[in-house]
Regions:
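Sec-dependent signal peptide recognition
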Residues: 1-8
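Sterically constrained small-residue positions within well-ordered secondary structures
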Residues: 9-11, 21
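N-terminal signal peptide c-region/cleavage motif recognized by signal peptidases
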Residues: 13-15
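Tandem repeat scaffolds
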Residues: 18-131
Length: 131
């Protein structure tokens, strides 16, 4: 009987959620994670990521794939999103003070209520973005 229970436990799918120690990847769950160091995330693929409430101040996300990601109420002060793809992502209520979005794909991004003070959008695609 014990071996059957052990077998069932081993065969059941894992329902664990991703944590703050998980490597950046598509669909990563970094909800409310606090990254206090300057993270180097150049060119990472994090499409469909769940990062609501994340702290990525000073992070370098240049050339990253963040399309369809939830970045709402996140902290991105001085973050570098240059040449990144954030197509259809949610940055509602995010703090993007002094963030660099130069040459980024921001089409259909929701910036409603976001702090964009002194952020740079030179050459960015803002087609249907909600500012």
């Amino acid at each position: 009987m014990r071996w059957m229970i052990l077998l069932l436990i081993l065969l059941l799918p894992s329902f664990a959620h991703a944590g703050c120690d998980d490597q950046p990847s598509n669909e990563v769950d970094w909800t409310n994670c606090n990254f206090v160091e300057n993270l180097d995330l150049i060119g990472v693929g994090m499409a469909n990521a769940k990062m609501s409430g994340v702290n990525l101040s000073l992070a370098n996300l240049e050339k990253s794939q963040l399309n369809n990601s939830d970045l709402s109420i996140g902290n991105f002060i001085f973050a570098n999103f240059s040449n990144s793809n954030l197509y259809s992502s949610n940055l509602q209520g995010a703090n993007c003070n002094n963030a660099n979005f130069e040459n980024a794909n921001l089409a259909k991004v929701n910036f409603e209520g976001a702090n964009l003070f002194t952020s740079s959008f030179k050459g960015a695609n803002l087609y249907e973005a909600n500012l």
